[in-house]
Amino acid sequence: MNIAGYIDHTVLRPTTTLADVENCCREAAEWGFAAVCIPPPFVKRTKTILEPTDVKVATVIGFPFGYSATEAKLAETVLALVDGADELDMVINLIALRMGDWDFLERELKLALEIIHSKGKIMKLIVESGILTTAELETACRRFGPLGIDFMKTSTGYAEKGAELDAVKNMRKWLPPQVKIKASGGIKTYAFARQLVEAGANRLGCSASVQIVKEAQNG
Protein backbone atom coordinates (compact mmCIF):
# COMPACT_ATOMS: atom_id res chain seq x y z
CA MET A 1 0.00 0.00 0.00
CA ASN A 2 1.36 3.43 -0.97
CA ILE A 3 0.25 5.07 2.26
CA ALA A 4 1.90 8.40 1.38
CA GLY A 5 -0.63 8.93 -1.40
CA TYR A 6 -3.46 8.88 1.15
CA ILE A 7 -2.00 11.52 3.46
CA ASP A 8 -2.89 15.18 3.97
CA HIS A 9 0.29 16.31 5.76
CA THR A 10 -1.12 18.59 8.43
CA VAL A 11 0.11 21.50 10.52
CA LEU A 12 -2.79 23.35 12.18
CA ARG A 13 -1.46 24.27 15.60
CA PRO A 14 -2.55 27.75 16.76
CA THR A 15 1.14 28.66 17.07
CA THR A 16 2.04 27.55 13.52
CA THR A 17 4.80 29.63 11.94
CA LEU A 18 5.84 30.17 8.34
CA ALA A 19 8.89 28.00 9.01
CA ASP A 20 6.57 25.18 10.11
CA VAL A 21 4.55 25.50 6.92
CA GLU A 22 7.64 25.60 4.71
CA ASN A 23 8.94 22.45 6.38
CA CYS A 24 5.54 20.79 5.91
CA CYS A 25 5.69 21.61 2.20
CA ARG A 26 9.23 20.27 1.83
CA GLU A 27 8.26 17.00 3.49
CA ALA A 28 5.11 16.69 1.40
CA ALA A 29 7.05 17.14 -1.83
CA GLU A 30 9.81 14.76 -0.73
CA TRP A 31 7.52 11.96 0.42
CA GLY A 32 4.76 12.34 -2.15
CA PHE A 33 1.84 13.18 0.13
CA ALA A 34 -1.53 13.92 -1.46
CA ALA A 35 -1.85 17.38 0.09
CA VAL A 36 -0.78 19.67 2.87
CA CYS A 37 -3.41 21.05 5.23
CA ILE A 38 -2.40 24.41 6.65
CA PRO A 39 -4.02 27.48 8.31
CA PRO A 40 -5.72 29.97 5.96
CA PRO A 41 -3.15 32.78 6.38
CA PHE A 42 -0.50 30.55 4.78
CA VAL A 43 -2.44 29.43 1.70
CA LYS A 44 -0.91 31.92 -0.73
CA ARG A 45 2.67 31.17 0.32
CA THR A 46 2.02 27.43 0.32
CA LYS A 47 0.58 27.57 -3.20
CA THR A 48 3.75 29.27 -4.42
CA ILE A 49 6.02 26.71 -2.77
CA LEU A 50 4.10 23.70 -4.08
CA GLU A 51 3.38 25.04 -7.58
CA PRO A 52 6.07 22.85 -9.22
CA THR A 53 4.74 19.69 -7.49
CA ASP A 54 1.60 17.55 -7.58
CA VAL A 55 0.88 18.19 -3.89
CA LYS A 56 -2.49 19.89 -3.34
CA VAL A 57 -3.07 22.82 -0.98
CA ALA A 58 -5.81 22.22 1.59
CA THR A 59 -6.97 24.64 4.26
CA VAL A 60 -9.70 24.86 6.89
CA ILE A 61 -12.92 26.87 7.15
CA GLY A 62 -14.75 27.62 10.42
CA PHE A 63 -11.96 25.83 12.24
CA PRO A 64 -11.93 24.28 14.76
CA PHE A 65 -15.40 24.65 16.31
CA GLY A 66 -17.62 25.30 13.30
CA TYR A 67 -20.01 27.78 14.90
CA SER A 68 -18.88 30.83 12.95
CA ALA A 69 -21.67 32.71 11.21
CA THR A 70 -22.43 31.39 7.75
CA GLU A 71 -21.39 34.72 6.26
CA ALA A 72 -17.99 34.42 7.94
CA LYS A 73 -17.49 30.89 6.64
CA LEU A 74 -18.39 31.96 3.12
CA ALA A 75 -16.00 34.91 3.31
CA GLU A 76 -13.23 32.58 4.49
CA THR A 77 -14.05 30.25 1.62
CA VAL A 78 -13.82 32.98 -1.01
CA LEU A 79 -10.51 34.27 0.36
CA ALA A 80 -9.01 30.78 0.52
CA LEU A 81 -9.95 30.17 -3.11
CA VAL A 82 -8.53 33.53 -4.20
CA ASP A 83 -5.28 32.65 -2.40
CA GLY A 84 -5.05 29.34 -4.25
CA ALA A 85 -6.57 26.59 -2.09
CA ASP A 86 -7.37 23.36 -3.92
CA GLU A 87 -9.29 21.67 -1.11
CA LEU A 88 -11.34 23.22 1.71
CA ASP A 89 -12.06 21.35 4.95
CA MET A 90 -15.11 23.05 6.50
CA VAL A 91 -16.29 22.36 10.04
CA ILE A 92 -20.00 21.73 10.44
CA ASN A 93 -21.95 23.91 12.89
CA LEU A 94 -22.18 21.43 15.76
CA ILE A 95 -24.51 23.68 17.76
CA ALA A 96 -27.05 23.56 14.94
CA LEU A 97 -26.52 19.83 14.56
CA ARG A 98 -27.08 19.14 18.24
CA MET A 99 -30.23 21.27 18.12
CA GLY A 100 -31.46 19.23 15.17
CA ASP A 101 -31.53 22.18 12.78
CA TRP A 102 -30.73 20.08 9.73
CA ASP A 103 -32.37 22.52 7.33
CA PHE A 104 -30.01 25.31 8.44
CA LEU A 105 -27.03 23.02 8.01
CA GLU A 106 -28.13 22.03 4.51
CA ARG A 107 -28.56 25.68 3.50
CA GLU A 108 -25.11 26.60 4.79
CA LEU A 109 -23.52 23.61 3.10
CA LYS A 110 -25.19 24.30 -0.25
CA LEU A 111 -23.95 27.91 -0.23
CA ALA A 112 -20.37 26.81 0.45
CA LEU A 113 -20.54 24.03 -2.13
CA GLU A 114 -21.78 26.42 -4.80
CA ILE A 115 -18.76 28.67 -4.28
CA ILE A 116 -16.21 25.86 -4.06
CA HIS A 117 -17.48 23.81 -6.98
CA SER A 118 -17.83 26.89 -9.19
CA LYS A 119 -14.02 27.03 -9.05
CA GLY A 120 -13.62 23.29 -9.59
CA LYS A 121 -12.25 22.74 -6.10
CA ILE A 122 -12.82 20.11 -3.42
CA MET A 123 -15.02 20.32 -0.30
CA LYS A 124 -14.43 18.19 2.78
CA LEU A 125 -17.12 18.45 5.48
CA ILE A 126 -15.82 17.89 9.02
CA VAL A 127 -18.48 16.39 11.29
CA GLU A 128 -16.57 15.48 14.52
CA SER A 129 -17.76 11.89 14.43
CA GLY A 130 -16.19 11.17 17.82
CA ILE A 131 -18.65 13.38 19.68
CA LEU A 132 -21.78 12.58 17.65
CA THR A 133 -24.23 9.87 18.56
CA THR A 134 -24.54 7.01 16.09
CA ALA A 135 -27.94 8.38 15.04
CA GLU A 136 -26.53 11.89 14.49
CA LEU A 137 -23.68 10.56 12.37
CA GLU A 138 -26.04 8.46 10.28
CA THR A 139 -28.36 11.42 9.70
CA ALA A 140 -25.40 13.62 8.73
CA CYS A 141 -24.20 11.04 6.21
CA ARG A 142 -27.63 10.44 4.70
CA ARG A 143 -28.59 14.14 4.49
CA PHE A 144 -25.30 15.73 3.47
CA GLY A 145 -23.81 12.97 1.32
CA PRO A 146 -26.29 13.46 -1.56
CA LEU A 147 -25.75 17.26 -1.62
CA GLY A 148 -22.47 17.00 -3.51
CA ILE A 149 -19.77 17.04 -0.85
CA ASP A 150 -16.55 15.46 -2.10
CA PHE A 151 -15.43 14.11 1.27
CA MET A 152 -16.80 13.69 4.75
CA LYS A 153 -14.05 14.08 7.35
CA THR A 154 -14.16 12.53 10.79
CA SER A 155 -12.51 15.11 13.01
CA THR A 156 -10.69 18.38 13.51
CA GLY A 157 -8.24 16.83 15.95
CA TYR A 158 -9.45 19.22 18.65
CA ALA A 159 -12.30 17.11 20.06
CA GLU A 160 -12.00 14.45 22.75
CA LYS A 161 -11.92 11.72 20.11
CA GLY A 162 -10.38 11.59 16.67
CA ALA A 163 -10.56 8.98 13.93
CA GLU A 164 -12.19 5.68 14.91
CA LEU A 165 -12.51 2.52 12.84
CA ASP A 166 -16.19 2.01 13.62
CA ALA A 167 -17.03 5.56 12.57
CA VAL A 168 -15.22 5.15 9.25
CA LYS A 169 -16.96 1.83 8.59
CA ASN A 170 -20.36 3.36 9.36
CA MET A 171 -19.68 6.42 7.22
CA ARG A 172 -18.75 4.18 4.31
CA LYS A 173 -22.01 2.28 4.79
CA TRP A 174 -24.21 5.39 5.01
CA LEU A 175 -22.59 7.74 2.47
CA PRO A 176 -23.20 7.55 -1.28
CA PRO A 177 -20.38 5.63 -2.98
CA GLN A 178 -19.05 8.72 -4.74
CA VAL A 179 -18.46 10.58 -1.45
CA LYS A 180 -14.99 9.89 -0.11
CA ILE A 181 -13.93 9.73 3.54
CA LYS A 182 -11.08 11.54 5.25
CA ALA A 183 -10.05 10.14 8.63
CA SER A 184 -8.13 12.47 10.91
CA GLY A 185 -7.21 12.93 14.55
CA GLY A 186 -4.81 10.72 16.48
CA ILE A 187 -3.33 8.80 13.54
CA LYS A 188 0.19 8.13 14.76
CA THR A 189 1.17 4.71 13.38
CA TYR A 190 1.25 2.93 10.04
CA ALA A 191 -0.76 0.05 11.50
CA PHE A 192 -3.66 2.34 12.42
CA ALA A 193 -3.40 4.27 9.16
CA ARG A 194 -3.64 1.03 7.19
CA GLN A 195 -6.63 -0.13 9.26
CA LEU A 196 -8.45 3.12 8.50
CA VAL A 197 -7.84 2.76 4.77
CA GLU A 198 -9.03 -0.83 4.86
CA ALA A 199 -12.15 0.36 6.73
CA GLY A 200 -12.98 2.77 3.92
CA ALA A 201 -10.90 5.95 4.34
CA ASN A 202 -9.69 7.54 1.11
CA ARG A 203 -7.58 10.22 2.77
CA LEU A 204 -5.79 10.52 6.12
CA GLY A 205 -5.11 13.75 7.99
CA CYS A 206 -1.82 13.30 9.83
CA SER A 207 0.91 15.33 11.46
CA ALA A 208 3.07 12.23 12.09
CA SER A 209 3.09 11.60 8.35
CA VAL A 210 6.82 11.05 7.85
CA GLN A 211 6.98 8.65 10.79
CA ILE A 212 4.04 6.68 9.35
CA VAL A 213 5.64 6.35 5.92
CA LYS A 214 8.97 5.30 7.41
CA GLU A 215 7.17 2.62 9.42
CA ALA A 216 5.51 1.40 6.22
CA GLN A 217 8.85 1.19 4.44
CA ASN A 218 10.43 -0.74 7.32
CA GLY A 219 7.62 -3.30 7.26
Q: What does each model-found stretch correspond to?
A:
Residues 1-31, 35, 43-63, 67-181, ...:
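Alpha/beta enzyme core
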Residues 38:
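N-terminal beta-strand-loop-alpha-helix module at the start
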Residues 184:
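Short hydrophobic "strand-cap" motifs at the C-terminus of beta-strands
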